[in-house]
Amino acid sequence: MLLLIKYTLLYGIVLMLVALGGMFSEHSGIINIALEGIMVIGGVAGVLTLTMLPADMSPFLVVLISVLVAALAGMVYSLLLAFASINLKADQTIGGTALNLLATAIAVVIAKYFSDSGSAKLNYSNKPFLFSIGGLELSIFVPLGIVLLVISYVVLYKTRFGLRLRACGEHPQAADSVGINGYKMRYAGVLLSGALGAIGGLAYIVPPVQTWNFEVGVAGAGFLALAVMIFGQWKPFNICAAAMFFAVFKSLANIADSTFLAQLHWSSNIYNMMPFIASMIILAFTSKNSMAPKAEGIPYDKGSR
């Protein structure tokens, strides 16, 4: 049971953070398919920072610097999507897909350049990111994720910025008529998405293991986070609940050999498939009732009415 809780929280927080990032982007009117790529960029930036920091540095500073660098890298990378979608009015789905493909290539090149073995694997210490409570080893991203969840809710529903962001995702022309700059708000939404997605990427890669092969990217976690966002109806606390639900399925692959599931003699690949199969089944029944922002995916033209 402790193992199930451990891995559910581990993967649930990752899915929640990335889905929250997608939520901000889509509430501004931009569909961020590039979450998978943003996770990879955030992961490689954070891991590379980890390898360069002094071994005797305070664990708090190690975590802080790594997270900030990852978030900054994600924001910079997300600017590519923002520029293509907002300024060039390019198709957001195609642009996001291209960035997903580019991210893995960039990460592999960077990893091979800095790796001692010349492979795409980077070794690092994950000890600063782990702590124990009552014999349960948890990731530092668990409390950080809870804090970011609350902040996301407050920002989205209790601030003027959040109101303006949501207005731009529902009817940007109406928002413009009352003096809200739709272009700036969409940029802000995508940048927030980049920061949270990149932190989620670092949270996915670092806590479980001490080496990562960037040729595998993040194994579809970004796409699963999109399903979590839709299932959570673009609302922070609903997204958290959906993330934990899908994380239970994801956790089965890690605990199967140490539970009664070992008697089934199933391959771990079957358990790894479960969250994706569950997402397809659930979305097939719930997508008709989804309340997506009305203007998402539609290029904003200030002159159109």
Where are these regions (language model features)?
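Membrane-interfacial amphipathic/re-entrant helices at transmembrane-helix boundaries
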Residues: M1-V18, I31, A45, P54-I65
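Transmembrane alpha-helical segments in multi-pass inner-membrane proteins
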Residues: W212-F276
